[in-house]
Amino acid sequence: MFEASLVLLVLVLLGWGIVSYNLLVRDRHRVAQAWSDVDVQLKRRHDLIPQLVEVVRRHAAFEQSVLENVTTLRNRGVAEASPSKLGEVETALSAGVQRLIALAEAYPDLKASRSFLDLQANLTDTENQIQYARRYYNGAVNNLNTRIETFPDLVVARLFAFRPAEYFEFEPVAAER
């Protein structure tokens, strides 16, 4: 009787360990997939910014410092891998892009340019997509981190060296209209 109870207890613990491990792996993959979605949108944004800079440069040659700042921030954003540090760069880049768009008020020919208006619409759409992807990613990070930090899953997480994921904190500057 005691041996059967012991075998049953071991089987239950083993089953729980397997289920817990599989849930942790699932959550880790969700975080990776969600980050991939964020990365796709950031790359789309990074591809649009040089086009916007070039359109503004053609119409507003005297705004060189704004153009250089946006270009520098875009290059830093492309190179950064850490979600927390990338969030800081992307927030600054968003402010720079908003300054570029605000230049249209001072240059009527730029404001009327079809390519500028198209780029502005694409950037607005991309900013919205980044926010959707960021929310999903941060939700996936929250699920994984909660599972890693709560008992009894933390036992399996520590045993298999699961690590918490970083949140992606990025708040774009609201467009001034």
Task: Walk through the language-model features, giving the residues of each.
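A helix-centric hydrophobic-segment signal that preferentially recognizes long
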Residues: 2-177
